[in-house]
Amino acid sequence: MQRPWRRALAVRLSIHLAFGAALPAQACWDDAAQRYQVSSALLYAIARTESGLNPQAIGRNGNGSRDIGLMQINSSWLPTLASHGINERDLFEPCINIHVGAWILAGNVSRLGYTWDAVGAYNATRPALRRAYADKVRRHLPAAIPAPAAPARRTTSASPR
């Protein structure tokens, strides 16, 4: 059974791709940001840092895991994502990938607060590596965007769908 959200996303994505756009529509960034209460500019900066905005990017890691798509979702998330009806092939769909990346970031924010440490945790577990990663992301933010500011208090723990 296909979920209505997924069907609507597929229709929007096919319309978007039919017009030859290289990147997901702004609505994908905004929808994910609103759903998971994170900044759309921050999501975009993470995607720029992770994949150079390439929705087909695949990164191979020294530990044997892979990073998939626009937001470079690590393959270690695949078992968890499968319980939400998302498989590896789905992660090459830019809007799905953005939503999953936003969900991961929101989990970090829930644990660490809306901080650069939470941004760094998107990519690294060690504090020094988190800081270095957050600095890379910060450089990809538009100049008018300040450091993460705390959004309204979270009231739900949404899934990546």
Language model features by range: what are they?
Residues 1-6:
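N-terminal secretory signal peptides that target proteins for export/translocation
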